[in-house]
Amino acid sequence: MTSFADLTTIGVGGPIATFLEPTTRVGVIEAVEEADSQGLPLCVIGGGSNMLVADTPFDGVVVRDARHAVSVLDEAAPVENGETIVHVNAEAGCNWDDFVDYCVNLGLEGVEGLSGIPGTVGASVVQNIGAYGQEVASSVESVEVWDRKNKQTKELTNQELHFGYRMSALKASMYSAPATPAADFFPTPRYVVLSVTFALHHSETG
């Protein structure tokens, strides 16, 4: 039986009743839907680097997104300062540092200052990770989510994500207040991240 100790970087946490690691977008949605339909506690995790879990059994479902594809979507028209914006999409389960390396190798700027932060792409926008005065919010175009309340996928824009210091509308939706929108979802938010689209630009150094 899988335990949280197997999934967290700190190596502690009790056994998990059901552990799922879907490899498709549909699989992620179905795993979440199944847990919600049965009224089971649901915990969707990323890299397990920001978790301290009790050693008592977790009688619910833990989902870890095993998808990690990254793709360049397009190149938009030049913005006002003359730079060309490049849209890059990454699936939620992609390791954050692997994503940063991918972008740097393509000569793209916007997330390189956040290299070395543990976790996944999906978790990065929930937490609005940051370092050295930079936050992931500054490079996010939109986030595709599964809305557990309305049972549908949804595209949330940067503005709709209400990013703040280590906070987002995604994270806030775990709590009854002061969530935007308010909902009782815990320990996983109302919105489960499926993929993130970033707006990056070409590096001047190539």
Predicted regions and their residues:
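Anion-binding (especially nucleotide phosphate/pyrophosphate-binding) glycine-rich loop
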Residues: 1-149
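FAD-binding subdomain of flavoenzyme oxidoreductases
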Residues: 113-114, 124-206
